[in-house]
Amino acid sequence: MGKYSLLLIAFFTCSVYGQVLTGRVLDEKRTPMGNVTVSLLSPKDSSLIVGTITDKDGKFSVKSERSDNLLKITMVGYTPKYINCNQCVELGDISIFPDSKLLSDVVVTGTNFTTKGDKMMIRVPEDVKKNTFDGYATLSAMTIPGLNVDLINHTVTSKTGEVLLCVNGREVEKGEIQALNPKDINRIDFYQKFDPNHPSASAVIDFVMKNRDSGGLVYGNARHHLNIGKGDGMLDVKHYKKNSELNFQISGNYGCYTLDRGEESATSMAFIDKKVIKTSEVKNSIFRSNHLRNRLSWLTQGRGSLFQISAFLNREHDVNDQNISQAYSTMGGEILTRDYTHKDNLSPATQLYYQRKIGKDGLFRTSIYGNYSHTDKFRDYTSTSSFWAKTEEDLFRVSPNMLVGLILGKNRPFFYATYDYKSTRNKYTENEVETKNRLTYGNGLFQIGNNFIFSSKFRVTLRFTENVLSIDNGNSSWTKFYFSPSLLCSADLGHGNTFRGELYTYVNDPQLAYYNGSSQQMDQYQILRGNPDLKNGHCMGGEAIFDSNHKWGMFELLTQYINMPKYIYEDVFVDNDKGMFVHTYRNGKSYNHFLFNTEIRFNVIPKKLIWMVGGEYNFFKERDKRLSALVGGTDLTYLGKNIIGKVELLSPFRYLAKGVEYKNPFSLKLTLKYTLKDLQIGFNATNPFMNNSSVETNYTADNYSNVAKTYNPRITSNMFMLTLSYRISYGKKHNFQNIEMGESQSSGLLDQQNIRNEKMESGKK
């Protein structure tokens, strides 16, 4: 009956320019199908004109401004259907049927999760779209084992390394994910190991978006702490015209508050003629800050090509006025110390980006990013002895890159190249004594490889990488080459089970600041100095991941081992002639880290309540230090009527990094958000009513030791925050997203206030 209806419509419906093509998509059982892709193509070359997806009732509407239309209906696991709908407006019911050959490559493991090749395709349910308001909240609500989504700092991390965030296959910055409308998400692709469009990435999250029925989009977000003068906000405006997009985004944060507690430490320093024990407590520290970030970009898209130009300006202003109570074993009484710092930064940047399809679904992509950064920092330290210091830095950065990826039968060869050039000139003045320093840094990466598709259930990716590293500090220079191969495999074991493994090598390259050889005074007895002679370690590692996906939930086992020779660690030694202890960085013995992690996700109440629980064992060996640590965590996610709530618990955990032992406290995070159409009101809390939560560090060297506890009340503990988001849209249908710019700000300065603030090492590919 549906076929005859379609023929009658084709014969008797008149062509109307600017009309809307409508229809309904059904499966082989004549059940309406949601999330089916409907594309309007040009009959001449089959190029995409516009597209959409069906709603939960299988209905769709596509606006057409021409009389000859070619409609393509596609759904994973189904045979694509093409319809010549000349002079058609109402298409009626359209049935599509399963493709037995295609289904052999797809493993359906649950209602919302499908595994195909190297990726997991995640269908976002309508209840999640309805109750979340941005990309981060949507990803968090899906509760995917192996992914950690931080809704406060807007970050996504995994145990296997950094997670690259994309929209429709294009790398984007976090502001774009924050402004993303969950209602426009077609699906989310999770590449745990290999993405052909980003072959050097450890893991990729790609938001596949549908077209919007709007000529513009305005998104605003504001957050403010309830018990401290601190907050941030963002305004994102997009305007579309034909095949182009103009985007303006402004974001920033502010702070004006006083902390009554900070770092509390005890330091022991043994000189040749005396031993000094110093105790220190930071009290009543005043913080003032305002950061402003502006971005303007223009994007145009042609047949299979895309070009974008972006401009960026960042301004930062920070004031930290610390009042410290100190005591020394060599003198009696309490000493009141003031440590005042004032920092300003200006950083403009620009980027050109171009990509084009080549061959059959191949890709050519190139971009160049440039950045200039100027930093002024002033410090006034008043104690038993006083000093003032001023630092000025000018940093230039250029970073081009290129990717060529092809599809040749069952092979996906690729070539990727990038180079990061940085040049810093800085001047450090202390008590009118001036020291100048310059440093030029280059890091090139050239990678070639292939993704071998042996069958629908087994793939292997081989990558060969050549790293070129160069350093020039004005007095000496060197250039070194490192060859780093890697081997990945993915296997479908059936019944919802998959295995992914990797053996890899990489170069452990320290940050630019560690090479800075200038000296900075920390206090009466301590100096911080970089090391221009640091070496690079040729590291290796391996990891294996087993996933088991079912309708009741998901289960993941992960194990990882990394070995880093010539590991960079903090070294402290005494200079008895000057009566000072010098903090610097050196290469030491190897660093070894082994972890075993497991996480289980339960659909406690389908579409309502999700519970995930996990545990991890870590073993660290760094030079002569060894550390074993267990950590456990759990989170509970609730989705209700326009409400999403989440509770996250993490037990205390310890780790080693650069010679320092860290102990992070118990962590509790609460999230509650209510959505009403285009408005969302939210509440976040971190470690509520826990005023004594602190990060502990412990460092010991010859003749020196330091034990410290760092408190951050009302920011990382006893923190309460209110959020408000609003979104409006208008006009015609378009679908473009921003390309990610490089780091908006770089610096080659060692900051003594950030010492002992290292993260746990993870594998890098």
Predicted segments — roles?
Residues 44-59:
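Short, acidic Ser/Thr/Gly-rich low-complexity loop/linker segments typical of extracellular
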Residues 22-34:
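Structural motif
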Residues 235, 259-275, 319-335, 350, ...:
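Outer-membrane beta-barrel translocator domains and adjoining extracellular loop/strand segments
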Residues 30, 57-59, 79-81, 88, ...:
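Membrane-proximal, glycine/serine-rich, low-complexity loop/turn segments characteristic
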Residues 41-47, 70-83:
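A short, solvent-exposed loop/turn motif at the edges and junctions
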Residues 397-399, 439, 445-447, 529-531, ...:
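Outer membrane beta-barrel strand-and-loop segments of large Gram-negative receptors
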Residues 342-347, 351, 378, 382-461, ...:
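Outer-membrane beta-barrel transmembrane domain signature of Gram-negative proteins
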